[in-house]
Amino acid sequence: MKKYLFVALAALVLTGCLSRPPEPEQPQPPVTVEPVTPPVVEEPQPPVTEPVPQPPKIQQLDWLSSVQPLVNQMLKADGVNPGSVLLLDSVKNNTNGSLQTAKATSALHKALASNQTFSIVPEAQLATAKQTLGLSADDSLGSRSKAIGLARIVSAQYVLYSDVSGDVKSPTLDMQLMLVQSGEIVWSGNGAVTH
C-alpha cells in the first residue's frame, strides 16, 4: 500500500511539471533612474545666549577704622576694671545682605591687641571652650546668653558682643560690653562702618 501511495504521489508531482520548454524572456528596457538632489541641510544656528549678569561685588569695608573709635570709647568707659579678661565674640551679620564679618572680628582683635585694660581670651582657648559646649570652632554664638555661658567657661569677666545691622550698603556696627557675672551692659556704642 505504501508503494502505491508513493507512486501516486510521484505521478502527481511529475504531472505538475511543465512539459514544454520555458519561453525566453523578453529583455526589458532599462529603467532610467533620475538623480535626486539631496535636500539642502541648513546649518543649525547656535542658540542666542543672553549675557550672564555680573555678580554683585563684595564691598570692601574698612573695618579697622570703623571699630577703632568704638574700642577707644569702650576702654575709657566707667565701670571697666583694668586687668580684666575679655571674651571677644565674633561679629554677627544682621544686615539685609552678605558681609565679611570674619574681617570685622579680625579688626576687633587688632584694635584690642595693644590695649592695657583687657587681656583677650586666646582664640585656641575659645575654640576649646566652644567644643566643650558642643559648638564648632567657627560657630557664631548668636546670642548674648551663649556668649556669657562661654565666658564663664574661660573665666572671663567681660564679653564684647558685636553685630552689624541695617542696610548692607551702609551698615552700622553695634557693640556692647557686658559684665559676665551679672549680664549687665557696662558700655554700648555704635557707629557707621566706613568704606
Curated annotation (Swiss-Prot):
GO CC terms of this entry: periplasmic side of cell outer membrane
Molecular-function GO terms, alphabetical: enzyme regulator activity
Signal peptide from the UniProt entry: 1-16
Biased composition range(s): Pro residues: 24-38, 44-55
Domain of life: Bacteria
Compartment(s) where it occurs, according to its Swiss-Prot or TrEMBL record: Cell outer membrane
InterPro entries: LpoB, Membr_lipoprot_lipid_attach_CS
Residue positions bearing lipid (N-palmitoyl cysteine): 17
Chain intervals for the UniProt region annotation (Disordered): 19-55
Lipid-modified residues, S-diacylglycerol cysteine kind: 17
Membrane topology: Lipid-anchor
GO BP terms in the entry: peptidoglycan biosynthetic process; regulation of cell shape
Keywords: Cell outer membrane, Cell shape, Lipoprotein, Membrane, Palmitate, Peptidoglycan synthesis, Signal
Main location group: membrane
PANTHER family per record: PENICILLIN-BINDING PROTEIN ACTIVATOR LPOB
Family under the similarity heading: Belongs to the LpoB family.
Subunit structure and binding partners: Interacts with PBP1b.
Function noted in UniProt: Regulator of peptidoglycan synthesis that is essential for the function of penicillin-binding protein 1B (PBP1b).
Name of the featured protein: Penicillin-binding protein activator LpoB
Organism: Serratia proteamaculans (strain 568)
